[in-house]
Structure formats: structure tokens, C-alpha cells
Amino acid sequence: MAKKNLIVGQSGGPTAVINSSLYGVVSEGLTHPDTIEHVYGMVNGIEGFLNDRILDFEEALPGDKLKGLTHTPGAYLGSCRYKLPESLEDPVYPALFKKFEELNIGWFFYIGGNDSMDTVSKLSRYAASIGSPIRVIGEPKTIDNDLVHTDHTPGFGSAAKYVASTVREITTDANVYEKRSVTIIEIMGRHAGWLTAASALARKYDGDNPLFIYLPEVAFDQDVFLKDLEKAFEKNCNLIVCVSEGIHDADGTFICEYDSSVGTDTFGHKMLAGCGKYLENLVRSRLGVKARSVELNVSQRCSSTLISATDQQEAIAAGRFGVQAALDGETGKMVSFIRQTDSEGNYQMVCGLEDVNAICNEEKTVPLTWITSDGHDVTEDFIRYARPLIQGNIEVPLGEDGLPKFVYRK
């Protein structure tokens, strides 16, 4: 059989281990020289590919340099938020497949979240419609953990570990003074509260901070919130409150919208960051106590020093599994994670495949049964689910300047 080439791209927001998934795809591709001649990367995703921006991994990261991807945050290939047209009759599709043919592409991999799986779906369906032999596989990633038909997603474990660690650190700082205070920590999550729920992992004992955790899966009532804080002050001096950026009231109005400064992004979506600051001002004005807000922002997804070893290993495994599946003829699929336990009841994960058409444009939220009846905490079921995903540490090499050493695209 004549050799063909493999191409891989990254899309959407980066994670601490999206480059580990990339490493898995590339390293596995390079172990099949009798079948795969070149392993190419799309610079800035499908959008960059349309503008002929590609690289050859054997030239860009030769030898041991490739392994540097596994401790490098961000997206080595760069990203994009380009959405392919809904109609497969659009001229962009024959243009893409003409480029694939010119590069002798036999396997296409896209690492990303929901919109990226939408791209995988469209490309695989178009390939089938024209009888193209190109295999199209999706590699999951998202710190939001909101992809359906998979136990969890690469990136969530490391982000959850960062959130829990940071919340624990903020708690120790807040406990310094014996003066009533409320610290509100705003965490990423528009519709799904998985990452905010992970703040519960910071607790060392029952009754420890964070005392309140608010997710977008449950409506937020400002008056009840203030009453809950007042009651908590009867036993506690310093209160830590963790909120998802997407919390909303019973009418569906985002809490951040009560701040008149909230704007919209280039897609017309409301810019949700700001609910923490709004609640800070609300607490200060209504309760008359010291209040501050902390927005974790992009640090949740780019911390290399707190990468979960479990998350990293699973991301690499997903990349390798996807290549093996594509070489076996699979297409139009996303690599999924299936949770298992060994004979001693310990956590294990195996990779599987799911029809990407059943995944794109769907969203997995935190089960309501994992949220306490009062709406401001998570149950032990969530703790058992999340704790295995943050286990283990990795060693990030340091440069001569004493700072983490990453690999960069030239």
C-alpha cells in the first residue's frame, strides 16, 4: 500500500495537556514509517490550513525535542475558532479536500472541544459524500469537561487540580485575620459547573472552606445567598465562596448582567467575567463586611506546575489510541474515556470510540443528583468522580533562568 501523510491540528481554548494529546498523535504516527510518510501540523487549525500554514514535525521538533510538548501549556500549533459552514455544498469543502489531496493526506486529526468535534463531523460526512478515503478522528480536550459520551475530558483533571490547589491557598491567606470577611472566587464555566465543583476538593475536613459552591446548573438567588452568608458567620469568621462565571437567576439572567459594564464578544456572546466583582460589591454594601473577589481566569488552563500526571498520561493515551483506530479504518469518531476499576477497586481508564455526530453541539452538565438540595455544594458522588483525575505530579524541567522550560514554535 502506498504511503500517505497524517495531519493534526488544535482548536478552541488551550489546556495544560492539549499538547500531550498532540504528542500522543505525533509520536504514534512516527512509529508507523511503513504506512505514514510525514506527520504534519496545521498552524492555527483549519483556518491556518486554508492559508497553507503547515509544518513537518520531524523538522520542527526532531528527536527528544518532541517530548517537550508533554509539559508545555498553551497550544503548540496555535488555535483558531473557525466554524465550517453548515452546508456541505459550500465551496470551502472541495477547497479543503483539494489541499488534502495535494499533501497526500490519509489521516486527519483535530484536537478540541465541541466546535472542533463539529468540524470533525462535517469533514467526515463530506469525505463520505465524495468517496474520499481520508480518515477523520476527533481528539477531545476541554477544561469545562462538558463533552458528552465520555467519562471526562483531557484538560479537566489538571484544571481541577489547579482550582482546588488555588482555593486551598486562598483559604490559608483569608484565615490570617480574625475579622469577618468574604472572599468570592470566580471560576470558568458558562453552562457547566464541573470546574467550580472541583473547588470542593480543596477541603481538608468537614466544614472547611469553601463553605459555598454555586454552579450554573442551579438558579442563584441573591437574597438567599446573603442570608446563607449571615448564618455562616455564626460559626465562621472567614467565608470562601466559589462561583461559576455563568451563574444565573431563576429568570435566566446571568448574575454578571446586573453589572452595567458587561459587554459582548465578537460573536455577540455576553462576556460573563464579572459576577465575582458584582457579588463582592453586593456583600460589602448589604452585609457591611470586608469582601474581595478573585477571578482565576486563564491561569486555570495554562498552569504547567500543577499538571495532573493522570491527566497527562490519559491525554497521551488518547492521542495514540486515535492514530491506531484511524489506521484500522475508523473515521467520524471521537476518542472517549471509559472509567473502570481494577480488582482492588482502584480507578482505571480505557479509551473507546464514539460517533462524533452524537457529540458535537451537545453539552454535559453536572448531574443535579451531585448537587446538594440547598443548591450551594456538591455531594460525595462528585468527590469520588473527580479525585482520581487530579492524582500525580509531573516534573517540569527548569531553564537556566530558573523558570519552566517549554517548547516553542518558530
Predicted regions mapped to residue ranges:
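N-terminal phosphate-binding or glycine-rich loops at protein starts, especially the Walker A/P-loop
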Residues: 2-54
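Accessory alpha-helical/coil subdomains and C-terminal extensions
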Residues: 99, 107-112, 118-133, 153-292
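Glycine-rich oxoanion-binding loops at beta->alpha junctions
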Residues: 52-106, 115, 154-156, 168
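Glycine-rich beta-alpha junction loops
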Residues: 43-47, 141-145, 187-192, 216-222, ...
